[in-house]
């Protein structure tokens, strides 16, 4: 193992130890949770730590007191702490980029235990992992393969009722991934409980040919922070994220960051 790789893992351990010593409850997500649930290992540029928004200030203060640079990158969902000896960082996540998937007590109540970097940890539950990943459909990133692999590995253990409750009125997004799962794994379609798929298809059938009433609204901004901006800016659709989940200023900062990353 290279010295650089050792330093990365040392940094991760230091962050975990600081948060543990500060009695700040956290969950591990991202690539490390994906590996825990599916066995699929991949290189990753960072560590994703999830916590309740109420614990964010304490977490950043503890890391800052230990000498690490910290920041609130986006006020509606993301903080960061940076290693002083490398370009490595840890994402500190308390919501999703679209404002929908807030980390709450249910995440912690259902978090499985494991180890990471030689430390006992809890991982984000598979249900909440699927829920959060389902809304990532950017041009440069799409988590559909992750969801297919999670369904393939964990479908028989999933709390499907809780997953349905998480998606709630966004059930069409879940149905889209279940449909794709049946396409990706045609010989293992039965892993998805028939009552789940039939229930979602009944909902879909009940809406065929029916428009929602009211001013035109675009829910595409829940899926991509940039690709549906034209609908809002030029075509007269209301951005469904505001003002309930994000302020207009948070939306603009989040969208501008996407444009900057593409340069």
PLM feature spans:
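Helical scaffold of the NTase/Pol beta-like nucleotidyltransferase catalytic core
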Residues: 1-28
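Anion (oxyanion) recognition and catalysis
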Residues: 20, 64, 115
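Catalytic metal-binding acidic patch
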Residues: 30, 35-63, 125, 147
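Conserved catalytic core of two-metal-ion nucleotidyltransferases
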Residues: 64-105
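Catalytic cores of NTP-dependent nucleotidyl/adenyl transfer enzymes across multiple folds
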Residues: 102-263
